[in-house]
Amino acid sequence: MSTLRLLISDSYDPWFNLAVEECIFRQMPATQRVLFLWRNADTVVIGRAQNPWKECNTRRMEEDNVRLARRSSGGGAVFHDLGNTCFTFMAGKPEYDKTISTSIVLNALNALGVSAEASGRNDLVVKTAEGDRKVSGSAYRETKDRGFHHGTLLLNSDLSRLANYLNPDKKKLAAKGITSVRSRVTNLTELLPGITHEQVCEAITEAFFAHYGERVEAEIISPDKTPDLPNFAETFARQSSWEWNFGQAPEFSHLLDERFTWGGVELHFDVEKGHITRAQVFTDSLNPAPLEALAGRLQGCLYRADMLQQECEALLVDFPEQEKELRELSAWIAGAVR
């Protein structure tokens, strides 16, 4: 019986793919070597310890229907589209060794005609006339008895969109959490015009088989049929939840200020696990009562635009004469935290 397992996803859903990865990792025998190949439609994937409001332009992502996905490994934020190929190598300990999986990817690139080399802890780079350019980034996760190495290869990604989503709004965030480091990148199509996802997957697969001296049939993983993986439904529900993707952000503070025709407003939020743990409001408005009431209502509220709007608009019952001001305030707060 082969010790290898090859899985290929035909889904572009990042939550589905990361849930598949998590389930395979948890239930694989320690003697198995796994290769999982996949790709995501428009998504920003953040590291386990990152703050999405600090790393991403969450407002632009919402406008452009770009998903946010938090992975279980560390590292920084990356933008995925269908011009990326994603790979995951898994193995039990003591065999797990990220230098092996790195060499498999380098061998695959070499077979395609690309000479790349490892750089730093996580990257693969190629030489260009403008200097070294990153074509692959990786992250890692280890438990007591197993580990995985996952990463991306830039094939034909729309690099102009990286700045759209990975440069956050200049919000006044005093945030804990790991900040991403931006690197100079290039696509493999600059070196291999016309290279496809399928060709890259084939090259990685062949290099994987060659390294271990075994071959195995690929298993196609599809959302059309619930994968036969233990606890998949629960894992997918968690992976796709706001509580995981946003709510797991490290503790941070957010300062908002705005000048309206009826007065200036300054809001201070402390946020932990996606909930507002403290809200302070300062204003020179001639009628501060609605804002003072709002500060009380926001304590414990989810740090989410629709929930904040809901709390603002609930004040209309007690302060109907301030409807215009409260609606302006509601729209401003919702826009500021998206």
From Swiss-Prot:
Keywords per UniProt: ATP-binding, Cytoplasm, Ligase, Nucleotide-binding
Origin: domain of life: Bacteria
Pfam families named in the record: Lip_prot_lig_C, LplA-B_cat
Alphabetical list of SUPFAM superfamilies matching this protein: Class II aaRS and biotin synthetases, SufE/NifU
Catalytic activity: L-lysyl-[lipoyl-carrier protein] + (R)-lipoate + ATP = N(6)-[(R)-lipoyl]-L-lysyl-[lipoyl-carrier protein] + AMP + diphosphate + H(+)
One GO molecular-function entry: lipoyltransferase activity
GO terms of biological process kind: protein modification process
Positions bound to (R)-lipoate: K134
One Gene Ontology cellular component annotation held by this UniProt entry: cytosol
Functional pathway: Protein modification; protein lipoylation via exogenous pathway; protein N(6)-(lipoyl)lysine from lipoate: step 1/2; Protein modification; protein lipoylation via exogenous pathway; protein N(6)-(lipoyl)lysine from lipoate: step 2/2
Disulfide-bonded cysteines: none
EC number: 6.3.1.20
Cell compartment(s), UniProt: Cytoplasm
Binding site for ATP: R71, G76, A77, V78, F79, K134
All residue ranges annotated as the BPL/LPL catalytic domain in the record: 29-216
HAMAP family: LplA (MF_01602)
UniProt similarity note: Belongs to the LplA family.
Role: Catalyzes both the ATP-dependent activation of exogenously supplied lipoate to lipoyl-AMP and the transfer of the activated lipoyl onto the lipoyl domains of lipoate-dependent enzymes.
General remark: In the transfer reaction, the free carboxyl group of lipoic acid is attached via an amide linkage to the epsilon-amino group of a specific lysine residue of lipoyl domains of lipoate-dependent enzymes.
Assembly: Monomer.
The name this protein goes by in its record: Lipoate-protein ligase A
